[in-house]
Amino acid sequence: MNQQLAICLGAALSIVMSTAVKSRAVDEWPQFRGPQADGHADSTKIPLNWRETENVAWKTEVPGTGHSSPVISGDQIWVTSAVEVKLSADEEKERLAAIKNSRGLEIAGSISLRAICFSRTSGKLLHDIELVKVDEPEPIHSLNSYASPTPILENGRLYCHFGTYGTVAVDTKSGKIIWTNAEHHVDHQNGPGASPAIWRNNLVINFDGIDTQYVAAIDKRDGKTIWQTKRSGKMNERVEFQKCYCTSAIIEDKDRGSQVISPGADWVYSYDPASGKELWKASYGTLGFSTVPLPVFGNGLVFVSTSFIRPRLLAVRYDGTEAKDGSLVEWQMDGQLPQKPSMLLIDDELYFVTDKGIGMCLDARTGSEHWKERVEGNYSASPLYANGRIYLFSQEGTTVVVNASKQFEKVAESTLDGGFMASPAVAGDALFVRTDTHLYRIEEK
């Protein structure tokens, strides 16, 4: 074989391999917010418009209740759900009366926490597996569910997490439980929220209750705890201001190494994912509790949004170097910020929608505002970026599409029968959305 032919074949093989890798990435949505946990989808053909009778390939009812997002691999789509045995109105009133600060809470008599699998092609139910049965569960907030954490799908295993009720690994082919870890218990006050993050063999999970606050790594192979690190930052003395519901972000940096970026109450922390050693922490200031949005990162900065009472957005240097004021915080802003939806970082712009429907675009390097506009609805689900556009999914069931640019431009609006609490997923050129009652496959017809 001559050198020129070898070069041509090598280039062709490189293109084929690159295409194959990209196809696998596009075809799977293995965790909360996608392959890179950033809300970005590679598809260029997701529809701009749909309704119950337009661009819906299938629609199937999901048993029980849950806010976990769909995760996808091959022909399988998995969600978690809680099938509740309701209390009577008098029983619920009596149970809640015994709880301090029970405003906004609701409670079930018992719950069956389940992993449910559907065919990506047809929407047919493939598995419905009880993972955990709980009698007399803790109360949850009316905006939460007992199955809010999104599972992780990897190499034929599904890793489901339910906060204080445990973590379970499932064989996706047989539907059999491989292991269960039920040793981590916290008082969430409002129910579970943090999804697991994965780093090599470690499932990294935040446990931030009103009684104890720590981060743990569970071995994905056997379910044993590898490390557990207590939060070190000083917090508000009131226990209800010590809780959090945030998922950790994993940063892989060839120069700086791997980090777990883990928001807790009043502080955002960085940990070594192998050992759990704290690397650095940065303060939000006071009342930085109940944090929900998953951090996003890029250009040496990680963006963290705290949640209730006094929302604050911080751009933190994740290499541990100090900014001009001697802190790790490059810039920060207060005011109208997302309390539940996560943000999108697209090149040098940071996009988000607040719970009350205020959309914003900022310069990610400086925090300066490009635009701020009201969009329809209330929001809990995190936005999606695909093909130059941002999709916003409201609790009322409306999806607003805007261009990802420094000027605000609304492109489309669509509505389905149910509301969105779960964030979307994409596989191939299809969009998968979970409403409060159904799972949909949406694609161009």
Model-inferred region functions:
Residues M1-L9:
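Bacterial N-terminal signal peptides that target proteins for export
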Residues C8-S18:
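Bacterial N-terminal signal peptides
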Residues V21-K445:
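Noncatalytic, solvent-exposed loop/strand surfaces
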